[in-house]
Amino acid sequence: SRSVAERLLSPSQVADVAAAMPARYRVLVLTAAWSGLRQGELLALTRADMDLDAFPARVMVRKAVRRTDAGEVRMDVPKTASSVRVVTLPEPLTDALRAHLEEFVAAELGALVFATSTGTTPARSNLGATWRRACAAAGVPHVRLHDLRHVAQVFAAEAGATLPELMARLGHATPAAALIYLHARTDRDAELTAALGAAMSRGSDGSTVTP
């Protein structure tokens, strides 16, 4: 399987791919990358699941889209009990969601947040093809749409999220998956090491360090 590093995008790359998506799906990309919701959770969101007037704004994850063996779309409970959660949103994403709701989402509380022009759940195959075209147009190395969940976990870890916070935010049932992302970026580790070195240098200025 691919390493975590092979599944990552930078914040600017996420913005570039989002800009290359059809307008209706741009904010879906941003929400995936900055909230960490699974694709099925994103596609199940309705107006009733969002509280953009709270501070910070938040979404309630309480259902997920599943596709049956017959190809039918069904709303189901999330993957695990820990997947039922409240996820807070950064302010720029909140602003983008407000604009998205106004332009693309029907007024009813049950209206899907990310839907086709007819208000139905987009087919994952179509969404995946659209995503691949956007990656190519943006000149971004191809990662899967699902990989935005991994991207979100690294963004949160780099922002200082602790292990319990990552588990709660991403809906992990065990620490194992979340731990991966606390160590995912070698460049971040290099930054940390450099900062430690600078602190050590400051501490030893004017003094002799003895073993």
Residue ranges: model-predicted function:
Residues 1-45, 53-55, 66, 82-84, ...:
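Basic, Lys/Arg- and aromatic-enriched nucleic-acid-binding interface segment
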Residues 15-26, 35, 87, 95, ...:
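Short, basic (Lys/Arg/His-rich) helix/loop patches that form interaction surfaces
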Residues 20, 45, 99-103, 181-184, ...:
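Residue-level signal for well-ordered alpha-helical positions
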Residues 19, 65-93, 106-107, 116-119, ...:
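C-terminal secondary-structure termini that scaffold catalytic or DNA-interacting sites
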Residues 35, 49-50, 173, 184-188, ...:
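The DNA-recognition helices of helix-turn-helix-type DNA-binding domains
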Residues 49-56, 142, 161-180, 204:
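Short, polar N-cap/turn motifs at the start of nucleic acid-interacting alpha helices
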